Curated annotation (Swiss-Prot):
Protein name as annotated: tRNA-specific 2-thiouridylase MnmA
Residues covered by region (Interaction with target base in tRNA): 102-104
Binding-site positions, ATP: G16, M17, S18, G19, G20, V21, D22, S23, M42, G132
InterPro entries in the record: MnmA-like, MnmA-like_C, MnmA-like_central, MnmA-like_central_sf, Rossmann-like_a/b/a_fold
Site-annotated residues for Interaction with tRNA: H133, Q350
Organism encoding this protein: Shewanella baltica (strain OS195)
UniProt function note: Catalyzes the 2-thiolation of uridine at the wobble position (U34) of tRNA, leading to the formation of s(2)U34.
Cysteine pairs bridged by disulfides in the record: C107-C205
E.C. no: 2.8.1.13
Localization in the cell: Cytoplasm
Residue numbers spanned by region Interaction with tRNA: 155-157, 317-318
């Protein structure tokens, strides 16, 4: 492997060490570039004493092994209180209101690039922080900093980082954003890092291996109700609207209906007032399709945002293909977005993230759907 010429001697970087391969290789690459590197392992969730759902202890062990191998110091910090107040309570409130939140986005906003950055600044005297996210940073000649999609289109994580400010991006390094995932694993293997073949973490960190319904039910009381067709026919019951999201197909328990065609059933709407789950047949059922949406709680990485009436791309969920759309501001906090073509399963509570080519501009929270 070719060595990288050190260019940043003396600059101190605190790497968020998760115990995974991406942060492991990030630390190695930054060392190769001449940075003074130290690791910081975050504990964001206080798991029950008698369960083994959370792999925090195993992850810490792996992070320590990698830091030992690289010869760098590993610090630990507990952000469980901040996580509960700023991420988990938001998660519960959104589900209670019938929406489908994305706690990973809130975790990045409140913990990884706020609490972590403040700790790295105030306690560890860092020049930069670094994370193993698949995004890129571009420093422009006018002094501005932009966030770009990761080189690996299948792993690009800019969708989860749209709430970062220009200042946060300028203080953050993303070494693996320039690489494909297979290259990251190859580097880890070549360097003898034990995380080289570690499985990627998936799902929500505080739920771990538990069933989602089981976990949510311990915090929010279930409210069973009817499942209806768009025509109002009752065809089953649900255990709680919070357990279902638009476009969901599995776990409805209504297969084999009489007088229905062979198309699978999908969640096409929720009637919160009546506590009714509305389902229709076919992945392109008219009630599942939206011609646009309103988006609020806007955040733009460079503070200014795209101009009114512009035609750009949006993602309404992770790994979705870019959706061409036109933006109109209804006020400074709300956008009306019209898609070029109807889109299925746009979900209130999820994030809409906007792009101009490679550049992640920012985004907001999907509020209302526009149909027809």
């Amino acid at each position: 492997m070719t060595s990288i010429e050190p260019t940043h001697t003396g600059k101190k970087v605190i790497v968020g060490m998760s115990g995974g391969v991406d942060s492991s290789v990030s630390a190695y690459l930054l060392m190769q570039q001449g940075y003074q590197v130290e690791g910081l392992f975050m504990k964001n969730w206080e798991e029950d004493d008698n369960n083994e759902y959370c792999a925090a202890a195993e992850d810490l062990k792996d992070a320590q092994a990698v830091c030992d191998k690289l010869g760098i110091k590993l610090h630990t910090v507990n952000f469980a209180a901040e996580y509960w107040d700023n991420v988990f309570e938001y998660f519960l409130a959104e589900y209670k209101a019938g929406r489908t939140p994305n706690p990973d986005i809130m975790c990045n906003k409140e913990i990884k690039f706020k609490a972590f950055l403040e700790f790295a600044d105030e306690i560890l005297d860092a020049d930069y922080i670094a994370m193993g996210h698949y995004v890129r940073r571009r420093d422009n000649t006018d002094g501005s900093t932009q966030m770009l999609r990761g080189v690996d289109g299948n792993k690009d994580q800019s969708y989860f980082l749209y709430t970062l400010s220009h200042e946060q991006v300028a203080r953050s390094l993303f070494p693996v954003g320039e690489l494909e995932k297979h290259e990251v694993r190859e580097i880890a293997k070549e360097m003898g890092l034990i995380t080289h073949d570690k499985k990627d973490s998936t799902g929500i960190c505080f739920i771990g291996e538990r069933k989602f319904t089981e976990f949510l039910g311990t915090y929010l009381p279930a409210q069973p109700g009817n499942i209806e067709t768009p025509e109002g026919e009752v065809i089953g019951t649900h255990q709680g609207l919070m357990y279902h999201t638009l476009g969901q197909r599995k776990g409805l328990g209504i297969g084999g209906m009489k007088n229905s065609n062979d198309d699978p059933w999908y969640v096409v709407d929720k009637d919160l007032e009546r506590n009714v789950l509305i389902v229709g047949q076919g992945g392109h059922h008219p009630r599942l399709m939206s011609t646009g949406m309103t988006v609020n709680q806007l955040h733009w990485v460079d503070r200014t945002g795209p101009i009114d009436g512009c035609h750009i791309a949006v993602k309404t969920r992770y790994r979705q293909q870019d959706v061409p759309c036109t933006l109109t501001y209804t006020d400074e906090h709300t956008l009306r977005v019209v898609f070029d073509e109807p889109v299925a399963a746009v979900t209130p509570g999820q994030s809409a993230v906007f792009y101009d080519g490679e550049v992640c501009l920012g985004g907001g929270i999907i509020d209302q759907l526009i149909r027809g």
